[in-house]
Amino acid sequence: MNKLKEEAKNKLIVALDYNNMEDAVKLTEKLGDKISIYKVGLESFLSTDGKLVDYLHEKGKKVFLDLKFHDITNTVKMACANAIRKKVFMFNIHCSNGSKTMKEVSDLVKESGSESLLIGVTVLTNLGEEDLQEMFRSSMKLEEIVLNLANLAKKSGMNGVVCSPQESKKIKELAGKNFVTVCPGVRPKFTLNADNKSNDDQTRIMTPSDAIKQGVDFLVVGRPITKAEDPVKAAEVILEEISEAL
């Protein structure tokens, strides 16, 4: 495997959004060595009693534990302590937990000696301007909110944030190039409709190639691979698109 293909492989995270162990295992077996990082979210974590994380580790894969912890400080810290014990590659908490919680969890990770990346969730990528206005009646624009939360995460010692690809470049300019951006809402060209829009619930989307050009560190892709007629071919197309943009 050449250097660019290896680099592309290390940027792609496949979301195992299944409600049973069998389907998740089948996909990982199909994809084999093509994929090295998988996302385990609420659906797959709860439906497998966390066993999917253990299975992936046994197979030598890295795990992004995407449980988006959001609660009072002590509860979030205790949950994160369990994530640290799982030795996952990265896990996340909501930035809207506030600076105090983010700082205490960041300190917890450092004190434990864990190598896990601690990532903050800014604004979910299925939300747009109208949604935020409806919920918060705020005069701040969506991008302003994302950048503010990312800045708080950086100041609190977090390793990076989950954001949409559109926001990655400005976050890097604000927080530095080593501040990690993890981006769902990545949709390869073959999944877009005639208006270049996604046919699913993601609203702030971008192609893998464009996301890489925006400086995104990790691209999270689920349905374009997991729901594809040929998941292996879909993964190969996405990896090729990433490597061409590097």
Predicted regions and their residues:
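N-terminal amphipathic alpha-helix/helix-capping segment at the start of soluble metabolic enzymes
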Residues: 1-25, 168-169, 173-176, 198, ...
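Conserved anion-binding
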Residues: 6-12, 75-160, 164-167, 174-178, ...
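Conserved, mostly hydrophobic/aromatic
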Residues: 14, 38, 68, 91, ...
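Conserved alpha/beta-domain cores
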Residues: 16-34, 39-57, 73-75, 151, ...
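Catalytic cores of alpha/beta
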Residues: 27, 74-83, 169-171, 191-217, ...
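Structural motif
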Residues: 33, 59, 86, 156, ...
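Conserved beta-strand positions in the central sheet of alpha/beta enzyme cores
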Residues: 36-39, 64, 89-92, 119, ...
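C-terminal helical cap(s) of enzyme catalytic domains, especially alpha/beta-barrels
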Residues: 102-108, 212, 225-246
